[in-house]
């Protein structure tokens, strides 16, 4: 099995329960075909570099998985048919870091800075 990071950009109108349901559907595909979810991160609501389908902001989700080609095809089909997902990207990696991603580290720093000035 190869290692991949899957980054999803999801419509901003979705609630946290709908986002959880979406990620559960994807992780069930992974586990049903003997893949493994190694890491899951919710990067929060972020501004897009440019408008995508009239959206200026969206939810970002990252799934680090161990999967074969069959699982990738199943995930790609599911993502393609899901209207809630604006964009997705599979990235093949050599190893998956167990530490918090830099995006989350920067986000928590910004939130702390905002809380201090309030």
Swiss-Prot record:
Name of the protein in its database record: Small ribosomal subunit protein bS6
Pfam families: Ribosomal_S6
A GO biological-process term: translation
HAMAP family per UniProt: Ribosomal_bS6
Segments forming a coiled coil: none
Task of the protein: Binds together with bS18 to 16S ribosomal RNA.
GO CC terms of this entry: cytosolic small ribosomal subunit
Gene of this entry: rpsF
Keywords assigned: Ribonucleoprotein, Ribosomal protein, RNA-binding, rRNA-binding
Domain of life of the organism encoding this protein: Bacteria
GO molecular-function terms, A-Z: small ribosomal subunit rRNA binding; structural constituent of ribosome
Similarity section: Belongs to the bacterial ribosomal protein bS6 family.
SUPFAM superfamilies: Ribosomal protein S6
